[in-house]
Amino acid sequence: MRLYRRARRQDEKIDRIEAILASAKNLLATNTLDECNLTTIASDVGITKAALYRYFRVKELIFLEIYRRELAILAPALQEAFKTPHVEVLAATLTKQPIFCKLTAVLGDVLEKPLTEDEAAEFKLYVLQTFEPLCLQLNQQFDLSQPQVIALLMHITSAVVGCWKLSHPSPMMAAALQQHEALADFRLDFAAFLQQHLTMLLGQMLPSN
């Protein structure tokens, strides 16, 4: 545990926020969101749980900020992937960011839930702004309108959500699937399952060559 004095200057507050986000992201890498405990994060940063609330009023906002940063990395990577739109490349681009995929799977029903109306609007506007270069590229590349591009991205997001949840069952369910060979078809690999899903999806959504 690192011991920090109270952050007073703006640069100290920024450093504290970065430390909280780094600790939370490291914890999420090997745990589910439910298992990411604020007490553990605060202890790792060297502050009390009460002090942590000075920076983030609820746990979900910590991980929503991590999601925003992951999205900022993913958006230009998707631009590269769509330059030669092969499903394998697109699926690999997504699976290279497991933190993004894990958070996407709980975005609507967990992370966005405590947002105020203003926060919700600001967040979605951020998503739209982040995807704007990709939208322009897909508009020019495939002659898709903005609503069509947004629909495509929403379908891809839905694929990530569904494939992640189905390929990451509860510990009890995972044990049951391993124990019974008759249930082998329910043992899903996220990367392979996502690629299969995108193959079926993109054939319907993207213009043929």
Which residue ranges define each predicted feature?
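Helix-turn-helix
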Residues: 19, 27, 31-61, 65
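Alpha-helical structural segments
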Residues: 15, 19-26, 44, 61-81, ...
